[in-house]
């Protein structure tokens, strides 16, 4: 049996809830390492639960102890949230433990893990197309910044996710006001904003080799274009696949990655914006795309690490995350969207989590709580 340990530090991070199901479909024995109220436990698809707290020192020490006491039991350890990746990346010095626990094989590229400035530096190192950026410091006055960057720009706090910690600044005259709103300026990234087509990508790598992937046109955001998404149209792309193969080998990606590109049609350039070396909420829904991550996991179990060489499929499918999208519809009065859910638009009912009562129940509680907030 192929044994995996799924690890989450952030109990309220709901994107972990369906990940055990994805591994179970691949035939794995699934252990989870998380707090008592974690979404990672809110399913029936894990075999054992190892309890920890969300206190960083306790979490780190318990995880390292668990791994060291079971050195050969787990074939794969998967960190599922940015906070866990950041904590363990900062804590581990041993190259053996680094490769055992963290999702890249090249320890020299560890800066990319849960770090906005780290990603920008890695892009510069390997000549990967990314928007022009600078690492902000108090020594950079407004005139210097305006000379180095073309506005509009984004202000990105170094450790941030789901759109939190990102600001849009349209003009240099507004920059100081934007800077005043930043809560943590350490390694703050100022980056040119590229107007183009946003492309969400999920990918699975093994030892730098691309195993499987999906890319998507973004159809709906929860709040603004820097927040998480609720509707996507999935497809395959030879251009994206080629970029992913290069990225995986250069960085040494070894696991899942949630990636964002923006395509500038006039320049014919795909700019890399985000690489979060972890799973996301969309990956379990790959079973509806024809490019299933559970099948990718099976390939890894079978030792099939060969690159994807077949031409991209022309098949497209629209997918929506039930609770997130319905919450968006209610929050912003999107009655058309609500009606689409009621009428099973494009087979949307497939995406309701009826296969698992535990996660369906917790999802329902969260939706009801949000609805009551909206009413009262």
Identify the function of each model-found stretch.
Residues 1-105, 372:
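ATP-binding N-terminal substructure of ATP-dependent carboxylate-amine bond-forming enzymes
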Residues 17, 187, 254-257:
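PAS/PAS-like sensory domains
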Residues 110-195, 206-209, 238-242:
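Active-site nucleotide/adenylate-binding loops and adjacent lid/helix of ATP-dependent enzymes
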Residues 163, 220-223, 276-290:
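Glycine-rich phosphate/pyrophosphate-binding beta-alpha loops
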Residues 170-249, 262-271:
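Phosphate-binding site of ATP-dependent enzymes
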Residues 249-284:
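Conserved metal-phosphate-binding beta-hairpin within the catalytic cores
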Residues 290-296:
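C-terminal, active-site-flanking charged/polar segments
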């Amino acid at each position: 049996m192929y044994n995996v340990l799924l690890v989450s530090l952030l109990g309220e991070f709901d994107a972990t809830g369906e990940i055990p199901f994805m591994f179970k479909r691949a035939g794995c024995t699934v252990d989870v390492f998380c707090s008592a109220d974690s979404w990672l436990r809110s399913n029936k698809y894990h075999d054992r639960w190892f309890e920890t707290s969300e206190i960083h020192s306790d979490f780190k020490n318990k995880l390292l102890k668990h791994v060291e006491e079971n050195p050969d039991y787990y074939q794969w350890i998967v960190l599922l949230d940015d906070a866990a990746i950041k904590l363990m990346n900062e804590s581990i010095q041993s190259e053996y433990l680094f490769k055992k626990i963290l999702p890249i094989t090249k320890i020299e590229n560890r800066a990319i893990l849960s770090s906005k400035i780290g990603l920008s530096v890695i892009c510069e190192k390997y000549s990967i197309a990314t928007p022009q950026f600078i690492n902000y410091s108090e020594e950079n006055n407004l005139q210097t910044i305006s000379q180095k960057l073309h506005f509009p720009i984004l202000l990105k706090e170094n450790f941030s996710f789901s759109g939190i910690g990102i600001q849009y600044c349209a003009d240099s005259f507004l920059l100081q006001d934007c800077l005043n709103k930043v809560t943590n300026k350490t390694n703050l990234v100022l980056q040119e904003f590229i107007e183009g087509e946003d492309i969400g990508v999920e990918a699975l790598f093994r030892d730098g080799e691309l195993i499987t992937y999906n890319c998507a046109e973004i159809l709906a955001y929860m709040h603004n274009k820097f927040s998480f998404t609720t509707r996507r149209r999935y497809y395959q792309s030879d251009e994206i696949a080629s970029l992913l193969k290069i990225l995986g080998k250069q960085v040494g990606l070894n696991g899942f990655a949630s990636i964002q590109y923006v395509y500038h049609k006039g320049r014919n350039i795909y700019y890399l914006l985000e690489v979060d070396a972890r799973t996301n909420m969309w990956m379990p829904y790959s079973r509806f795309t024809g490019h299933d991550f559970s099948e990718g996991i099976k390939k890894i179990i079978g030792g099939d690490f060969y690159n994807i060489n077949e031409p991209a499929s022309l098949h497209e499918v629209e997918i929506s995350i039930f609770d997130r999208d319905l919450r968006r519809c209610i929050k912003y009065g999107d009655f058309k969207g609500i009606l689409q859910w009621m009428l099973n638009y494009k087979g949307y009912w497939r995406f309701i989590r009826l296969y698992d009562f535990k996660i369906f129940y917790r999802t329902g509680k969260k939706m009801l709580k949000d609805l009551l907030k909206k009413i009262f």
